[in-house]
Amino acid sequence: MLERIKDSFTHSIQTKIDASEALPESIAKAAEMMVHCLLGGNKILACGNGGSAGDAQHFSAELLNRFEVERPPLPAIALTTDTSTITAIANDYSYDEIFSKQILALGQPGDILLAISTSGHSGNVIKAIEAALSRDMTIVALTGKDGGPMAGLLSINDVEIRVPSNSTARIQEVHLLAIHCLCDNIDRTLFPQDE
C-alpha cells in the first residue's frame, strides 16, 4: 500500500514535469485572452462534470473572491452550482443541455467559456461549447487524453490546454495547477505587485 501511494506521487510529479514542457504557452495565451475579456467588461463562464465541476467552481471562486493578492472581485460564473436550474433543464429537456441553455441566456459576445473535461467527450460540455460559439464567445478548454470531440470544435481563436496524460486523476491534478496559473497570471497582469 505504501508503494502504491509513493507511485501516485511519482506519477503525479512526472505528469506535472511533462505538462511544464507542453502547457505554458497555452496557459499564457489563455490568461491573456481572459485578461482582455475582463478589461473589455465581459465575464468568464465555467463548466464541467464531477471533479471538473469542482474545478469550474474553484476557478470562479478565485476570481470572484481573490487568489493570492488583494484585489477587486472579477466576473466569473460557474454554471455548475444552481441545482434548481440544472435539474429543471435535465428533467424538462436533457442532461446534455444543462450548460448550453444557461450559456444561451447568460453568454454575450466577448465572454469566455472555460470548458473542462478530462476526456473531451462530455456531451453537455460539448453542447456548451457549441452554444458559446453561437454567442460569439471564445473557448478555453481544459482537456486530457486525445482531447476528444471538444478539441475538434475549437478554432485558432480558442485555446486548448491538453494535459499529456491518459490518467483521469493525473489530468485533474494538472487542471487544478493550470487553473492556479491562470488566476496568478490574471492577477499579476491586472494588478501588478512589487515583488
Curated annotation (Swiss-Prot):
Catalysed reaction, written as an equation: 2 D-sedoheptulose 7-phosphate = D-glycero-alpha-D-manno-heptose 7-phosphate + D-glycero-beta-D-manno-heptose 7-phosphate
Coiled-coil zones: none
GO MF assignments: carbohydrate derivative binding; D-sedoheptulose 7-phosphate isomerase activity; zinc ion binding
Entry function: Catalyzes the isomerization of sedoheptulose 7-phosphate in D-glycero-D-manno-heptose 7-phosphate.
PROSITE patterns: SIS
Pfam family, one: SIS_2
HAMAP family linked: GmhA
Protein residues bound to Zn(2+): 58, 62, 172, 180
Family from the record: Belongs to the SIS family. GmhA subfamily.
Domain SIS, residue spans: 34-195
Free-text comment on the cofactor: Binds 1 zinc ion per subunit.
Binding site for substrate: 49-51, 62, 91-92, 117-119, 122, 172
EC number: 5.3.1.28
Miscellaneous remark of the record: The reaction produces a racemic mixture of D-glycero-alpha-D-manno-heptose 7-phosphate and D-glycero-beta-D-manno-heptose 7-phosphate.
Pathway assignment: Carbohydrate biosynthesis; D-glycero-D-manno-heptose 7-phosphate biosynthesis; D-glycero-alpha-D-manno-heptose 7-phosphate and D-glycero-beta-D-manno-heptose 7-phosphate from sedoheptulose 7-phosphate: step 1/1
Subunit details: Homotetramer.
Gene that this sequence comes from: gmhA
Catalytic class of the enzyme: isomerase
Name of the protein this chain belongs to: Phosphoheptose isomerase
Known cofactor(s): Zn(2+)
PANTHER family attached to this UniProt entry: DNAA INITIATOR-ASSOCIATING PROTEIN DIAA (PTHR30390:SF6), SEDOHEPTULOSE 7-PHOSPHATE ISOMERASE / DNAA INITIATOR-ASSOCIATING FACTOR FOR REPLICATION INITIATION (PTHR30390)
BP-aspect Gene Ontology terms: carbohydrate metabolic process; D-glycero-D-manno-heptose 7-phosphate biosynthetic process
